Amino acid sequence: KNRAKYGLAPIRNFGYHAGERSYNYLLFSQHLGNIDPDWTFKWSIGGYCFNDTFQYDEKAYEEMISFVDSAQSPIIFFTLGSCSSKDGNRFSKALVDICKKHDYRLIIGSGWAKTGITLQADKHLFLMKQPVPHNLIFPHCDGVIHHGGCGTTHSVGRAGKPQLITPLIIDQPYWSYRIHQLGLGPEGLKIAKASEQEIERKVCDLVTNPLYKKNAAHIGEMIQKEGGIKNICDSIERFQ
């Protein structure tokens, strides 16, 4: 109505219209994300801005390290971050059963949704009820299973670890697609639909596939060199 008032044509896609007339600074890694060749936007990719200054529960961290050091078997980390799923606990239980069968160990980051909170910890399971930053967790893992949020995807990428994504909302299916396309992990899983056999097959692939390990380590080195925070600060200063 406002555009008609001033004799302007209607806009079918406001997001595209606004982006086309602005300078777009993309806060993701060029080594993980990509751009559409059909874009007519003015854009640059500056790298992800990691925050490694989070306060955390030191006791929870020390308990996690004790669990890590208690054996030599592979470690998987699972989290849904700030997302929730009515199938989260069923999926968590399936992961525990798989870890017991194959002698893997599982760390579950319960998060806001308290995923897996009803499970009983044992030598195969550590339930992390208090938050610990990703940069202190992922270097100890052999694989990470997560919801596919941009931040978690980049944190696993920076750590140089294989990942398996269980996308739920928004951009998560995109990151799931990219991780598999780049050879950094198996094709994503739908928590609500995946059978126990499919979960087991993809978890074992995540942990044992040497190609994922090689590709993830290479990508990790490149992401660590990007300097996303410095890049965006430099970009802002150039506009002044």
For every predicted segment, state its role.
Residues 1-240:
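Catalytic core of nucleotide-sugar-dependent glycosyltransferases
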